[in-house]
Swiss-Prot record:
Residues 1074-1097, 1162-1194, 1269-1302 are annotated as: Disordered. This is Glutamate receptor ionotropic, NMDA 2B. SMART domains: Lig_chan-Glu_bd, PBPe. Component of N-methyl-D-aspartate (NMDA) receptors (NMDARs) that function as heterotetrameric, ligand-gated cation channels with high calcium permeability and voltage-dependent block by Mg(2+). Participates in synaptic plasticity for learning and memory formation by contributing to the long-term depression (LTD) of hippocampus membrane currents. Channel activation requires binding of the neurotransmitter L-glutamate to the GluN2 subunit, glycine or D-serine binding to the GluN1 subunit, plus membrane depolarization to eliminate channel inhibition by Mg(2+). Keywords: Calcium, Cell membrane, Cell projection, Cytoplasm, Cytoskeleton, Disulfide bond, Endosome, Glycoprotein, Ion channel, Ion transport, Ligand-gated ion channel, Lysosome, Magnesium, Membrane, Metal-binding, Phosphoprotein, Postsynaptic cell membrane, Receptor, Signal, Synapse, Transmembrane, Transmembrane helix, Transport, Zinc. The modification Phosphotyrosine is found at Y962, Y1039, Y1109, Y1133, Y1155, Y1475. Residues 604-623 are annotated as: Pore-forming. It comes from the Eukaryota. The chain crosses the membrane at residues 558-576, 631-646, 818-837. Phosphorylated on tyrosine residues. Phosphorylation at Ser-1303 by DAPK1 enhances synaptic NMDA receptor channel activity. Residues 577-603, 624-630, 838-1485 are cytoplasmic. Residues 1290-1301 have a biased composition (Basic residues). The extracellular N-terminal domain (ATD/NTD) endows NMDARs with a unique capacity for allosteric modulation, harboring several binding sites for small molecule ligands that act as subunit-specific allosteric modulators of ion channel activity. A hydrophobic region that gives rise to the prediction of a transmembrane span does not cross the membrane, but is part of a discontinuously helical region that dips into the membrane and is probably part of the pore and of the selectivity filter.
Length: 1485
């Protein structure tokens, strides 16, 4: 019994109680902490909905669980509210309160703020009076409101006004707390805004004074603005609206905007509130009371959970409202920081420092005609979204006065209405634009999305609307039409702008609205403010430039007149004036002189005028006569104007012409039958407009065809035109003209420069039977009367393509632009080719018959051509000599040929120095046939085999066998070469002299066809003068196979035979050529030195000077001749012109360098010269000559080379001018084409120096010692040329040295150093032409000690020696100046080979020496080798001795012998070209 008693002892029960308490505490510690929240609802709130909201398991994720106490109250007095909250704190241990009421008493918020500040308990006012604006809260209060602050509501009110462009407003407020914040916010916003706000009045009403309505009425009467902002309580607002209604401020035209404080409970609307009142309110529709309660609980719970997570505790519940510990204050302040920043379910539920929501859900409500609050807008995320794009004007139904604020619809169509976006900075429209709303039509649109977007409109119609509204005094709201375009009746219902007016949604329709009969039945139209109609727009297409575009700057008449004036009038006039001028070019004909002198022909006149027209720097011959000069000056003035006009207009015609489709009208074939064209013509318009209606009513087929090409808008149509998808666009003319004027690149044009079909106009559509029509018509007519309509048209309707010229863009001209010029050149080339072929056919086949050769009589065509030739070239043809001198008579009349031959022989016998040779003319006369220059009748005599004549034996008859040779020669002459009949070089302005270029000096020109066109290909075995006569019997018809001159020397009388450039404008000095000789001698020297261009010098003057020089006598009486076999000499000459294939052309050779040994050997050789007939034994073949060459006395021109030099050069390829060996030419080439390398030069010599390189010709060696004597082989003849020490010294002294450039002023001061070469005889007439004191006054005087022409026995070598080396002789110093080195030296005297080219200050001569392969080397002297040549005396009479130069003999294939034994230094700056002397180097350099 005892143990049982112990089990049931009191200690046992105590242990069990302790364990139970411990278990309960353990379980309590495991559950999350909770916070007590009281939800107090005042009034008839939906408690069931609230209970469901907070019982949902929405807070399980939080670390603190809310413990909600739901309390319902009916009393709203302060005592009841305070008592109930304090009881809950003490009984339920609550830690937060969520308060909601259904009253409009803002005092509840003040009571709640007081309780929160005293108890440090967070209280949330979520609805009713508890959420109304409370301006000044206690600093220690934790009272938060679900509503916007005063500043937030003020900003929303300004946004509403900005949305509808209500910029003029006033403010009315009472002394309710927060009014200052409201006014300050408004002022600060409008001051810092880009919008042009205008705050007219700010009224502060004192509602505490009980003095009746008089004071408030007087203050409200000051208001004139249509928009009024009111800040007060709901009760105060009721009284203010009552007074405002009495003064007429609540009627139509006035809009009141109030905050949520005034609206209060939306379920109760005071009767004093005017219809159309706008309020900013908390969202009661989308954010109801259950959602607010739930968010209130979540805010307190989330803040406590965040505090627990960071600080591990939550505020302790307060047991009483009357005592507050410091620990409680600390915890409450900490919880307050978490309440401000709360985010729940992704929504920002934060509060500001003032206790208002940072992102409240606000709505804009409107008191409609049913006296109910209608939500018309929403404020969300700082953006306003309104329901109405045009604010509906609400007015009481009792008011029947007409509205002066109109709703106007428009349509975007530039330039009449242009729509732009608002300014991104201010969000408003800029100046000169009008706000317009664009409705958004979307099937998926929700209520939260706005029904429109704000735009800005401007344009021609908008400016007219602004002026009309100002004149008629009405305001308007503008919006853009969305259901259609201008207006079309579909199924009995109108759409577009007409439909808006018909349905009375808009009072007016302004835009590009065409007036037509169908529309006029349903609406009224104003008078048209612009004329329009139907027009057609097309696109320009790039065309092509006409090939004759370069001729289009002038018409065909102008071109014809220009050429007529040039060829017929002006050129003939200049020619006639010059021909009959006493000082003209043809004065020699008037003086009775010999015809053939220089003349100014019609061809030269045409060439002169042509060059002046086109500014070509061509060589022309200017007239001398005063009358002709005046005529040319006038023509030059005409040429300037002509060319300037052509150049100025050329660019415009070279631009590609653009093609535009031409359409005559809507009845054009392209519109009525578009399929007849390929491709079919495509056109369209914009549907639902007056243009489509007009086409549909009048052209049914056209309307049916264009349906597939219709465009959605004007912009789409323009793009289709540019891309080629559309050929034509039919639309209103006013719109198309504007688009064409503003098109980029001006590619779009309207046909006929804006041609209009079916003319009509644009008008303003007004509701039917409206009282505004008359006032609008008068306003439009007033705009026309004041000229403002024209200003608007110039501003909006005139484009850059209409008003301004397009800027010409710089661009490159392609081949299409210049095609015509190239076509012209191609045609000219083809015509030239045809002319070339015809010329050759006529020349080689038909001209002989026309010349009378076939019939033996001069033909009529020939006579006419000679007459024309005489007229053009100024050559007089004597009637008595025409038959005698004609080529036909020369070819067919044997008697005349013999007479002409004898006359030529006589002239040659009387002249010495033929072609510059020191021999007598008789030395050239031989038995072979000769050719008379029958073209120019200049009595020039040339051998038929083109050889110089080797003197026959002394006993031979001088003219043996001449008669038979002439008969044989002229009888068998075949006329196949024009050069037989005409001397190209001396075509018509040279006297008939033996010194002409057709004489023998032309045969050795490097450019002569016998040396260049068909050079002889020499066989390995040299020629032998002892060939059988059968070898020469085949040469009787040789004269028709070669020409004496190449085309290079084709005759033009401007080609002066001197080394002056024909195009040079420099001058040379002359003595006066004409006039009395006595008078000329009295004149001063400088007065006699007339200046004239080189191209204007008389050809006769030069030829007479040249002729005088060539008549110079031999130098000494010991002049000797060396005769060779006549037959061999003839063979040698014939070989020069024998046509050979594969024979190279001759090259230019520089023979400037002269050896010292040349003069020395020359002097030594001349000591033992043989007699005239002694050298015939030397023509025999020697036994040691492998090739049949007989050793003999060397010719006088082979005097300066040693045997060693010759042996070295005969076996290899060496430079012509220096001893450099050419390694790039093989011996094989030498054997095959030996004639080509005879004048080959090295690169250094080719590149050596230019014309002005003075040191180039001064590079000659000066050797004071004479050449060492050389051994003479035993088989060589003993004849040597005599040489004296005196001559050697003289040669050193006068050896050719290059002088520097002399100016003209130094000529007179130069001392006379050497005597000039005097002619044998000079006529007094010619001698008088040279003035005393001029540089050429003593040119024809014979120096002292000069031998006459009497002695023919002196050797050529001695003569040549004296020519150069005799101090008293006339040797010339080589100078690069045009002017002479001495006053007695004439630079214009043609020397030997004057037709040859000038290379670096010296003449180049082209003579070749035959290659001797394996020649005997027994004699070291070069004279022994040269003696074996059969052609040593070939150039005996042709080479003047005054040029001590190395020569290549004949047309043989051996290399030429250089004068300089040292290789010439390569001058890299030289180009190696051949230069002609300029008229004055000094003035050029």
């Amino acid at each position: 019994m005892k143990p049982r008693a112990e089990c049931c002892s009191p200690k046992f029960w105590l242990v069990l109680a302790v364990l139970a308490v411990s278990g309960s505490r353990a379980r309590s510690q495991k559950s999350p902490p909770s916070i007590g929240i009281a939800v107090i609802l005042v009034g008839t709130s939906d408690e069931v909905a609230i209970k469901d909201a907070h019982e949902k398991d929405d807070f399980h994720h939080l670390s603190v669980v809310p413990r909600v106490e739901l309390v319902a109250m009916n009393e709203t007095d302060p005592k009841s509210i305070i008592t109930r909250i304090c009881d809950l704190m003490s009984d339920r241990k609550i830690q937060g309160v969520v308060f909601a009421d259904d009253t409009d008493q803002e005092a509840i918020a003040q009571i709640l703020d007081f309780i929160s500040a005293q108890t440090l308990t967070p209280i949330l006012g979520i609805h009713g009076g508890s959420s109304m604006i409370m301006a000044d809260k206690d600093e220690s209060s934790m009272f938060f409101q679900f509503g916007p602050s005063i500043e937030q509501q003020a900003s929303v009110m300004l946004n509403i006004m900005e949305e509808y462009d209500w910029y003029i407003f006033s403010i009315v407020t009472t002394y309710f707390p927060g009014y200052q914040d409201f006014v300050n916010k408004i002022r600060s916003t409008i001051e810092n805004s880009f919008v042009g706000w205008e705050l007219e009045e700010v009224l502060l009403l004192d509602m505490s004074l009980d003095d009746g309505d008089s004071k408030i009425q007087n203050q409200l009467k000051k208001l004139q603005s249509p928009i009024i902002l009111l800040y007060c309580t709901k009760e105060e607002a009721t009284y203010i609206f009552e007074v405002a209604n009495s003064v007429g401020l609540t009627g139509y035209g006035y809009t009141w905007i109030v905050p949520s404080l005034v609206a209060g409970d939306t379920d109760t609307v005071p009767s004093e509130f005017p219809t159309g009142l706008i309020s900013v309110s908390y969202d009661e529709w989308d954010y109801g009371l259950p959602a607010r309660v739930r968010d209130g609980i979540a805010i307190i719970t989330t803040a406590a959970s965040d505090m627990l997570s960071e600080h591990s505790f939550i505020p302790e519940p307060k047991s009483s409202c009357y005592n507050t510990h410091e620990k409680r204050i600390y915890q409450s302040n900490m919880l307050n920081r978490y309440l401000i920043n709360v985010t729940f379910e992704g929504r920002n539920l934060s509060f500001s420092e003032d206790g208002y929501q940072m992102h409240p859900k606000l709505v804009i409500i409107l008191l409609n005609k049913e006296r109910k609050w209608e939500r018309v807008g929403k404020w969300k995320d700082k953006s306003l979204q309104m329901k109405y794009y045009v604010w509906p004007r609400m007015c009481p139904e009792t008011e029947e006065q007409e509205d002066d604020h109109l709703s106007i619809v428009t349509l975007e169509e530039a330039p009449f209405v242009i729509v732009e976006s608002v300014d991104p900075l201010s969000g408003t429209c800029m100046r000169n634009t009008v706000p317009c709303q664009k409705r958004i039509v979307s099937e998926n649109k929700t209520d939260e999305e706005p029904g429109y977007i704000k735009k800005c409109c401007k344009g021609f119609c908008i400016d007219i609307l602004k002026k009309i509204s100002k004149s008629v005094k009405f305001t308007y709201d503008l919006y853009l039409v969305t259901n259609g375009k201008h207006g079309k009746k579909i199924n009995g219902t109108w759409n577009g702008m007409i439909g808006e007016v018909v349905m009375k949604r808009a009072y007016m329709a302004v835009g590009s609205l065409t007036i037509n009969e169908e529309r006029s039945e349903v609406v009224d139209f104003s008078v048209p403010f612009i004329e329009t109609g139907i027009s057609v727009m097309v696109s320009r297409s790039n065309g092509t430039v006409s090939p004759s575009a370069f001729l289009e700057p002038f018409s065909a008449d102008v071109w014809v007149m220009m050429f007529v004036m040039l060829l017929i009038v002006s050129a003939v006039a200049v020619f006639v004036f010059e021909y009959f001028s006493p000082v003209g070019y043809n004065r020699c004909l008037a003086d009775g002189r010999e015809p053939g002198g220089p003349s100014f022909t019609i061809g030269k006149a045409i060439w002169l005028l042509w060059g002046l027209v086109f500014n070509n720097s061509v060589p022309v011959q200017n007239p001398k006569g005063t009358t002709s000069k005046i005529m040319v000056s006038v023509w030059a003035f005409f040429a300037v104007i002509f060319l300037a006009s052509y150049t100025a207009n050329l660019a415009a015609f070279m631009i590609q012409e653009e093609y535009v489709d031409q359409v005559s009208g809507l009845s054009d074939k392209k519109f009525q039958r578009p399929n007849d064209f390929s491709p079919p013509f495509r056109f369209g318009t914009v549907p639902n407009g007056s243009t489509e209606r007009n086409i549909r009513n009048n052209y049914a087929e056209m309307h049916a065809y264009m349906g597939k090409f219709n465009q959605r808008g004007v912009d789409d149509a323009l793009l289709s035109l540019k891309t080629g998808k559309l050929d034509a666009f039919i639309y209103d003319a006013a719109v198309l003209n504007y688009m064409a004027g503003r098109d980029e690149g001006c590619k779009l044009v309207t046909i006929g420069s804006g041609k209009v079909f079916a003319s009509t106009g644009y008008g303003i559509a007004i509701q039917k039977d409206s009282g505004w029509k008359r006032q609008v018509d008068l306003a439009i007519l007033q705009l026309f009367g004041d000229g403002e309509m024209e200003e608007l048209e110039a501003l909006w309707l005139t484009g850059i393509c209409h008003n301004e010229k397009n800027e010409v863009m710089s661009s490159q001209l392609d081949i299409d632009n210049m095609a015509g010029v190239f076509y012209m050149l191609g045609a000219a080339m083809a015509l030239s080719l045809i002319t070339f072929i015809c010329e050759h056919l006529f020349y080689w086949q038909f001209r002989h018959c026309f010349m009378g050769v076939c019939s033996g009589k001069p033909g009529m065509v020939f006579s006419i051509s000679r007459g024309i030739y005489s007229c053009i070239h100024g050559v007089a043809i004597e009637e008595r000599q025409s038959v005698m001198n004609s080529p036909t008579a020369t070819m067919n009349n044997t008697h005349s040929n013999i007479l002409r031959l004898l006359r030529t022989a006589k002239n040659m016998a009387n002249l010495s120095g033929v072609n510059g040779s020191p021999q007598s003319a008789l030395d050239f006369i031989r038995r072979e046939s000769s050719v008379y220059d029958i073209s120019e009748h200049r009595r020039s005599f040339t051998h038929s085999d083109c050889k110089s004549y080797n003197n026959p034996p002394c006993e031979e008859n001088l003219f043996s066998d001449y008669i038979s040779e002439v008969e044989r020669t002229f009888g068998n002459l075949q006329l196949k070469d024009s050069n037989v009949y005409q001397d190209h070089y001396h075509h018509h302005h040279r006297p008939h002299s033996i010194g002409s270029a057709s004489s023998i000096d032309g045969l050795y020109d490097c450019d002569n066809p016998p040396f260049t066109t068909q050079p002889r290909s020499i066989s390995k075995k040299p020629l032998d003068l002892g060939l059988p006569s059968s070898k020469h019997s085949q040469l009787s018809d040789l004269y028709g196979k070669f020409s004496f001159k190449s085309d290079r020397y084709s005759g033009h009388d401007d080609l002066i035979r001197s080394d002056v450039s024909d195009i040079s404008t420099h001058t040379v000095t002359y003595g006066n050529i004409e006039g009395n000789a006595a008078k000329r001698r009295k004149q001063q020297y400088k007065d006699s030195l007339k200046k004239r261009p080189a191209s204007a010098k008389s050809r006769r003057e030069f030829d007479e000077i040249e002729l005088a020089y060539r008549r110079r006598p031999p130098r000494s009486p010991d002049h000797k001749r060396y005769f060779r076999d006549k037959e061999g000499l003839r063979d040698f000459y014939l070989d020069q012109f024998r046509t050979k294939e594969n024979s190279p052309h001759w090259e230019h050779v520089d023979l400037t360098d002269i050896y010292k040994e040349q003069s020395d050997d020359f002097k030594r050789d001349s000591v033992s010269g043989g007699g005239p007939c002694t050298n015939r034994s030397h023509l025999k073949h020697g036994a040691g000559d492998k090739h049949g060459v007989v050793s003999g006395v060397p010719a006088p021109w082979e005097k300066n080379l040693s045997n060693v030099d010759w042996e070295d050069r005969s076996g290899g390829n060496f430079c012509r001018s220096c001893p450099s060996k050419l390694h790039n030419y093989s011996t094989a080439v030498t054997g095959q084409n030996s004639g080509r390398q005879a004048c080959i030069r090295c690169e250094a010599c080719k590149k050596a120096g230019n014309l002005y390189d003075i040191s180039e010709d001064n590079s000659l060696q000066e050797l004071d010692q004479p050449a060492a004597p050389v051994a003479v082989p035993s088989n060589a003849p003993s004849t040597k040329y005599p040489q004296s020490p005196t001559n050697s010294k003289a040669q050193k002294k006068t050896r050719n040295k290059l002088r520097r450039q002399h100016s003209y002023d130094t000529f007179v001061d130069l001392q006379k150093e050497e005597a000039a070469l005097a002619p044998r005889s000079v006529s007094l007439k010619d001698k008088g032409r040279f003035l005393d004191g001029s540089p050429y006054a003593h040119m024809f005087e014979t120096p002292a000690g000069e031998s006459t022409f009497a002695n023919h026995e002196s050797s050529v070598a001695a003569a040549g020696h004296r020519h150069h080396n005799n101090p008293g002789g006339g040797g010339y110093m080589l100078s690069k100046s045009l002017y002479p080195d001495r006053v007695t030296q004439n630079p214009f005297i043609p020397t030997f080979g004057d037709d040859q080219c000038l290379l670096h200050g010296s003449k180049s001569y082209f003579f070749r020496q035959p290659t001797v392969a394996g020649a005997p080397k027994a004699r070291p002297d070069f004279r022994a080798l040269v003696t074996n040549k059969p052609v040593v005396s070939a150039l005996h009479g042709a080479v003047p001795g005054r040029f001590q130069k190395d020569i290549c003999i004949g047309n043989q294939s051996n290399p030429c012998v250089p004068n300089n034994k040292n290789p010439r230094a390569f001058n890299g700056s030289s180009n190696g070209h051949v230069y002609e002397k300029l008229s004055s180097i000094e003035s050029d350099v």
